[in-house]
Amino acid sequence: MEDLNEANFSHLLINLSNNKDIDAQYASTLSVVHELLSAINFKIFNINKKSKKNSKSIEQHPVVHHAASAGREFNRR
């Protein structure tokens, strides 16, 4: 069996849930599964978008660390 990509799987769920020859409860379950997958994909999309935005921000404004020499401590009083 070939791997199903996301679009094909979504299309399959929609077609099966709209099929008049299957049990209504089964069709409802398929619709719920489709909605859950859509919600998960939306969350993943937003996380990826936020991650890309953060990585671009870091590239534009690199963090500079000022380290003390080994064995020396700062007196911060």
UniProtKB/Swiss-Prot annotation:
A Pfam family per the record: Chordopox_A30L
Keywords assigned by UniProt, alphabetized: Phosphoprotein
Function: Required for the association between the dense viroplasm and the viral membranes to form the mature virion (MV).
Subunit structure: Interacts with protein OPG092; the interaction stabilizes both proteins. Interacts with protein OPG062.
Underlying gene: OPG157
Region span, Disordered: 53-77
Keyword Phosphoprotein set for record: yes
UniProt PTM comment: Phosphorylated by viral OPG054 kinase.
InterPro entries: Chordopox_A30L
Similarity comment: Belongs to the orthopoxvirus OPG157 family.
Protein name: Protein OPG157
